[in-house]
Amino acid sequence: MDNGSATGISESKVNQYKGEAYFMLGFAYCELTAYYGDCVLNKGMTLDEAYVATRSPKNEVLAYAFECLDKAAEYLPNSYKGQQRPTKGAALGFKARFALFHEDWQTAVDAAQKCMDLGVYKLHDNYREMFQATSSPEFMFYFKGDLTLKKGYGFMENVRDFVIRKIGGHCNQSPSLELFCSYTCTDGLPIDKSPLYNPKDPFANRDPRLAMTIQPFKTKYSADYAEYEQSKKDGTFPEKYPDYITLGYEFNPSPYANTVYEVSTGKMVVNTDSKASNQHSAYNGLILRKFVKDDWKDFNNYNLKADNCYPYLRYAEVLMTYVEAKNEMGQCTQDDLDKTINLIRERAYRETGIAYPRVEVQSQEALRKIIRMDRRSEFAFEGIRYRDLLRWRIAEKSHNKSMYYLNRAWSNSANWNGLTGSESNIELSQDFITLLKNWDEGNYPIGGIPTIDENGLPNLAPMETAGYITTFYKMS
């Protein structure tokens, strides 16, 4: 950055490289402060200085990180053609994200507002199609897989873990039942409050993002179950019920569903995604739909990879950052809600024929719950939830409770009665069992950074004295 003008490169290119350098520098320090708090701040050390450097206060490091992102926003353009490079909006968007993480509400609002004022980004018209698209006006910073290079990003480094066993997948990375239950009903109420929720037909009357994120399936209690079954006999199933097909097959995790519809032949074939035939089918009966594309069927040809765009920052997050920060400052207005969370909800309900549940101004605590639930629904499987749990100080609760899985079909359970989602009833139905997942509150990957001793090994004694968990630093 100091010597760019002496290289003979055009000023516009020098400015681009400066912007990208500031972007990476600011982003890296934001990540460090999010996970470690205080950290070494290097603004140009000599080697001797680096040997004795100590951690700088988190607020000092964060201020420098935001300064770098501001400089990046000054140098970077609004957009590029045909290239995946950081832009002005990405710099501002990440500044908003990390300001929110550190509860710097005003900075988060200001950075998000600048993103919104750029006029460059907008919500993708269709929520489900966005995650199958090769580009989107909503993507502010993303990675694109490449099947020629056999490279995927995010969990698409190994899609076999997410696809059905019928085509050779493992299907062992399931959406949690807690995520499933967190989606509201179409009246905007959670399932334990809404009269619309039917535990025996759990996808009915739910936020449309549920069936766009988790693969839906029919139960014999569904209102149109007779028509559903008839369509498989008369060959109209793919046309009438496309949402219940994944990768060429009907999905039905019920232990009583011995066969499923195969699109290519129009015939019923053995169901290998049910506990009736495979003990390792989806452990809780749920599989991912978000991101899944038909060409995932060929995952073995591409070293298990997929070429989806994996959004690391979406415009929807900027909108949700804005409204959350405004609410935390006690300044959230109806206009704020309408241009953020309500805009996102309207998109989710578009083309469904159902009016979206408009969020209206109410108490700060009530809005806080709504905003947090919507973040979970909107950004599932996009790498955001973990940091949200940390900054909301609820990870010790969410990670220290039961998880629910289906028993094998031959476990002497009498019925598979659907999903009730009741926190007070540990056995969600007779076929659900619980596995306790423990979480030590002190075991967050935040805080301790070991010094290095004369042998080049981490010196853990000061960390242990300070109360940090150091297990993950020790060699086995």
Give residue spans per PLM region:
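An aromatic- and glycine-enriched ligand-binding surface/loop that stacks and positions planar moieties
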Residues: 88-263, 399-416, 423-424, 429, ...
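Conserved, well-structured interaction surfaces
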Residues: 1-36, 50-52, 56-60, 69-83, ...
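C-terminal substrate/ligand-recognition segments
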Residues: 208, 212-344
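TPR-repeat structural position
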Residues: 62, 105, 332-334
